[in-house]
UniProtKB/Swiss-Prot annotation:
The lineage of its organism: Bacteria, Pseudomonadati, Campylobacterota, Epsilonproteobacteria, Campylobacterales. This is Uncharacterized RNA pseudouridine synthase HP_0956. Belongs to the pseudouridine synthase RluA family. It holds the Pfam family PseudoU_synth_2. Coiled coil: none annotated. It comes from Helicobacter pylori (strain ATCC 700392 / 26695).
């Protein structure tokens, strides 16, 4: 028996540090099941599958704003390293794909954009693939309390902040529902926590969904965003085509 990251480092001919990072990023699986613990003891002949990570791509750019497609498994904070001179305006969870906006730091437009977020004048639309059948549009209004340690975790609590999510079913197949999701507030993990709250967790959500899944990622995609006269759309990856 040997620690998983050490076996992976030999298989991929990479350092132990890189092997740990791949596992921690959710990119390594065994027999279709995601490996969650880098130090897990496994047989030395274990074979891993390592998922490749796409690079971010430009959707739109002008003197004010840069709209990017963020693939899953890239930290939002790392996007600025790909595009020098731009500052991150908002963020998506690591495994969430979709449109992310950057602006010129401390520019006049940057200040206006930050105010738009603060005033809830930004319209966002997501796609989520969830467990179970949801047949009607509904509003989920449940306060969310977030704990921030090494990793953020949120839950429904009367002590939490107001959180409102609107879901609309787009397609139902094999006891799964593809949802259009709108949010009136922007709490940490809001969509993920609200969908768990109504017993329809997002497929592939290893934090809030205990059901096993063959999905290689969290099935949540930031589809559209609009603010200050701009509107952008990131086409959903093929895994959302059910």
């Amino acid at each position: 028996m040997e620690k998983a990251y050490k076996i992976l480092s030999v298989q991929e001919n990479i350092s132990h540090k890189k092997a740990k990072a791949l596992i921690d990023s959710g990119l390594v699986s065994i027999g279709g099941k995601k490996l969650m613990v880098a130090r897990k003891e496994l047989p030395k002949n274990t074979h891993f599958s390592v998922q490749k990570v796409e690079k971010p791509s430009v959707i739109f750019e002008d003197e004010n704003i840069l709209a990017l497609f963020k693939p899953p498994f890239i930290e939002s904070y790392d996007l600025a390293s790909f595009f020098k001179g731009w500052a991150l305006l908002h963020r998506l969870d690591k495994e969430t794909s979709g449109v992310v906006l950057l602006v010129k730091e401390n520019s006049e437009f940057h200040l206006k954009a930050k105010k738009a977020f603060k005033d809830r004048a930004v319209k966002k639309e997501y796609l989520a693939l969830t467990q179970g059948i949801i047949e009607e549009e509904r509003e989920i209004n449940a306060p969310i309390l977030t704990f921030k340690t090494t990793k953020a975790f949120s839950k429904i609590s009367k002590k939490g902040q107001e959180a409102v999510t609107i879901i609309t079913p787009l397609k139902i197949i094999n006891k799964k529902t593809l949802l259009k999701v709108g949010i009136k507030t922007g709490r940490t993990h809001q969509i993920r926590v609200h969908l768990k709250h109504i017993n329809h967790p997002i497929i592939g959500d290893t934090l809030y969904n205990n059901e096993p899944s063959l999905a290689k990622r969290l099935m949540l995609h930031a589809h559209k965003i609009a603010l200050l006269g701009y509107e952008f759309e990131a086409i959903a990856p093929k895994e959302f085509e059910i």
